Regions:
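Hydrophobic pocket/interface hotspot
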Residues: 11, 38, 84
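Arg/Lys-rich, positively charged N-terminal/basic patches that mediate binding to nucleic acids
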Residues: 1-35
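Generic alpha-helical structural context detector
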Residues: 20, 40-43, 86
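Enriched for short, Lys/Arg-rich terminal
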Residues: 75-103
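Short proline/glycine- and basic residue-enriched helix-capping loop/turn segments at helix->loop/beta transitions
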Residues: 46-47
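Basic/aromatic recognition patch in beta-strand/loop cores that engages polyanionic ligands
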Residues: 39-40, 50-82
Length: 103
């Protein structure tokens, strides 16, 4: 099985916070369901499937896709796993948050 993506530390922290918040607000079953949807969204973006927006004007190669209530940001790489840069809630100031992320 080939790894299609890797989570940068900041994206991993985003995912942990999403899990914590979802579990606290809606319980374990909803958390599992939401995480499966996010995982599918991450996989799709990593492989260039589905709908995504080219954000190269912000950073070379950067892609963004909406998944449920979040936006996933990814930098695909040739012959290497895609880098997942951030997973941010739709109500956040996305560009401000991204500016503080490693590039």
């Amino acid at each position: 099985l080939t790894t299609r993506y890797v989570l940068l530390a900041a994206a991993e922290a985003d995912l942990r916070e999403i899990i914590r918040y979802t579990r606290q607000q809606w319980g374990n079953a909803q958390t599992r369901s939401y995480m499966l949807k996010l995982q599918d969204g991450i996989e799709s973006l990593a492989t260039g499937q589905g709908f995504f927006k080219d954000m190269s004007a912000f950073h070379p190669g950067l892609r963004m896709a909406r998944c449920e209530h979040h936006y996933i940001f990814c930098i695909p790489r040739n012959d290497m796993p895609a880098l997942m840069v951030a997973i941010l809630h739709k109500q956040m100031d996305l560009m401000t948050r991204l500016e503080s992320r490693p590039k």
